[in-house]
A protein has these predicted regions:
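Short, surface-exposed, low-complexity cationic segments
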Residues: 23-46, 56
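Short, compact, well-ordered microdomains
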Residues: 55-81
């Protein structure tokens, strides 16, 4: 399956498991995960807040059913939220 079969180029949101999810949510999670694992306290807090906000969408997409977070601290954070 191609990305445009999930969300065409002209569509920015989709319904998945009853949630409206914005295109780019997975990419934003990856960016925030990188920041969280490498950042100072202020950046880390901002990244953690965004990760927590996006978790329902990521779970609705089934992201963690097929991928496992390798960083133990980040995995514990996500599992605890």
């Amino acid at each position: 399956m191609r990305a445009d079969q999930i969300l065409p180029d002209d569509v920015n949101h989709g319904q998945f498991d009853g949630l409206t999810i914005r295109k780019g949510t997975v990419a934003a999670f990856l960016a925030n995960a990188r920041t969280w694992t490498r950042a100072d306290a202020d950046e880390r807090a901002q990244a953690q807040s965004q990760i927590a906000e996006d978790l329902p969408a990521l779970r609705a997409l089934g992201l963690f059913e097929v991928l496992e977070i390798r960083d133990e601290r980040l995995r514990a954070l996500v599992e605890g939220l």
